[in-house]
Amino acid sequence: MKIGKFVIDGNAAIMGILNVTPDSFSDGGSYTTVQKVLQQVDQLIAGGAKIIDVGGESTRPGYQFVSAADEIERVVPMIKAIKAKYDVLISIDTYKTETARAALEAGADILNDVRAGLYDGEMLALAAEYDVPIILMHNQKEEVYQDVTQDVCDFLSARAQAAIDAGVPKDNIWIDPGFGFPKSVQHNMELLKGLDHVCQLGYPVLFGISRKGVVDALLGGNTKAKERDGATAALSAYALGKGCQLVRVHDVKANQEIVAVLSQLM
């Protein structure tokens, strides 16, 4: 498979989550030193991750805003350290253009924007300037939908076209339906059932549902984040069967065999 100019073996791949934040819902505070980050990256790569997604601000419900300066201070040293030791693709999980530019200069390869370029109006131009892949995620302020699947498809189509209009080659555009941003459990369930429609929009799709609240709901509620990895792996298999090509997860090893097998059947 290809993500922009980068070629990855197989027809599907795993993006390993690396939160260098104090307050992420699943692993906040776990990876705040270079040593701990490199130990975790060792595990992610050994487990089969082809992309490391580095984030410096939590996007969990009720998250605390982080300035671009603080975000840069968190992510840039980690990106440099990872690139110095490993030959692995790095995506920067940010919606701030200032942070994204600093991350690209530090060695990041891919932009992963949970605001789809809408936060400061400059992210799409940055992707075009650096000729890097960008992942555009569905996100909106309120849980109000006429038809959640159709609304998500319309949003992603419009944002992808905006990226093209800004000079981003179509081959550099990936989309993400944005499970949990902001969607009720019912909205997430409907979107899961309609995932094939997202995959038919003409852009490769990232599937990111790892350890989220909808997974807890599917398990009956009251589970801890790390207790959701088995269900996350099952949903990864479902998503790959629907046509997604990239799964973003915390526990890479639990998903690796699923991706390895299903990518040969896609």
UniProtKB/Swiss-Prot annotation:
It comes from the Bacteria. CDD domains: DHPS. It catalyses: (7,8-dihydropterin-6-yl)methyl diphosphate + 4-aminobenzoate = 7,8-dihydropteroate + diphosphate. PROSITE patterns: DHPS_1, DHPS_2, PTERIN_BINDING. Residues 12-260 form the Pterin-binding domain. Pathway: Cofactor biosynthesis; tetrahydrofolate biosynthesis; 7,8-dihydrofolate from 2-amino-4-hydroxy-6-hydroxymethyl-7,8-dihydropteridine diphosphate and 4-aminobenzoate: step 1/2. Mg(2+) binds at N19. It holds the Pfam family Pterin_bind. Keywords: Folate biosynthesis, Magnesium, Metal-binding, Transferase. Gene3D superfamilies: Dihydropteroate synthase-like (3.20.20.20). Its cofactor is Mg(2+). Its EC number is 2.5.1.15. InterPro entries: DHP_synth-like, DHP_synth_dom, Dihydropteroate_synth-like_sf, Pterin-binding_dom. (7,8-dihydropterin-6-yl)methyl diphosphate binds at T59, D93, N112, D176, K212, R248, V249, H250. GO terms for molecular function: dihydropteroate synthase activity; metal ion binding. Belongs to the DHPS family. This is Dihydropteroate synthase. It comes from Streptococcus pyogenes. The gene is folP.
